[in-house]
């Protein structure tokens, strides 16, 4: 049975535990904030490097496959579509990297153009969608609605969003065969812009 003298000790111990828990939480939040700031800074530098035509290497990622339809991919690369896709494993082929979300109206506007371009360049150019800030169920409905004919992966956090310096959706990056970014489009992409980026990606590996 607790004595009156032991009760203050228990309260003191409980207070210490609560303070330590609060400090741990604050420390974790600060670490997350620092990580976001650093990543966002790296993303900004990446965008600036692309703007200056420095052809930086695209930040690597390994993300879960949301949509495994690889019918427009070269047959030799279709075995890469498992539970996850690693960007660096796609080197050797030009890549159109499209960041999107199901709630994004401009993403819906450009989706048919991406599907058409993927079909036109079947076997020559890899189209890869990256779904961000979205629900998986809504994203799959979007992909079914537009009969998307290329693979999409999903980032449930903000890693790729920050690493690529995204300022909104959609955004598209064009990678050459060496994994270097040769073109970048912010916002809804037109057919002309899409073909121009693909031309740069096809020629950029030389």
Describe each region flagged by the PLM:
Residues 1-74, 206:
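N-terminal targeting signals for export/organelle localization
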Residues 99-116:
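Conserved redox-active cysteine motifs that mediate thiol-disulfide chemistry
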Residues 61, 70-71, 85, 99-100, ...:
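Conserved hydrophobic/aromatic "anchor" residues
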Residues 93-95, 100-103, 168:
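Short pre-active-site segment immediately N-terminal to redox-active cysteine/selenocysteine motifs
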Residues 95-97, 128-130, 173:
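Conserved hydrophobic packing residues within short motifs/helices of P-loop NTPase cores
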Residues 62-95:
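A short beta-strand-turn-helix
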Residues 141-149, 154-206:
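Thiol/disulfide oxidoreductase modules built on the thioredoxin-like
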Residues 109, 119-157, 169:
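Conserved segment of the thioredoxin-like fold in thiol-based oxidoreductases
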């Amino acid at each position: 049975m607790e004595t009156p003298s032991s009760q203050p000790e228990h309260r003191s111990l409980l207070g210490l535990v609560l303070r330590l828990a609060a400090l741990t939480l604050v420390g974790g939040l600060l670490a997350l904030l620092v990580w976001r700031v650093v990543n966002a800074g790296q993303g900004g530098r990446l965008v600036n490097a692309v703007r200056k035509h420095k052809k930086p290497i695209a930040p690597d990622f390994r993300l879960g496959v949301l949509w495994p339809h690889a019918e427009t991919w070269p047959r030799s690369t279709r075995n890469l579509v498992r539970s996850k896709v690693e960007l660096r494993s796609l080197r050797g082929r030009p890549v159109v990297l499209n960041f999107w979300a199901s709630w994004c109206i401009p993403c819906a506007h450009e989706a048919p153009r991406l599907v058409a371009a993927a079909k036109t360049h079947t076997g020559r150019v890899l189209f890869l969608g990256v779904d961000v800030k979205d629900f998986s169920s809504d994203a799959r409905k979007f992909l079914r609605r537009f009969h998307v004919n290329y693979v999409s992966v999903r980032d449930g956090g903000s890693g790729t969003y920050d690493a690529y310096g995204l300022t909104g959706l959609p955004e598209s990056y064009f990678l050459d065969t060496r994994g270097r970014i040769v073109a970048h489009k912010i916002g809804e992409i037109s057919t002309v812009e899409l073909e121009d980026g693909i031309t740069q990606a096809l020629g950029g590996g030389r």
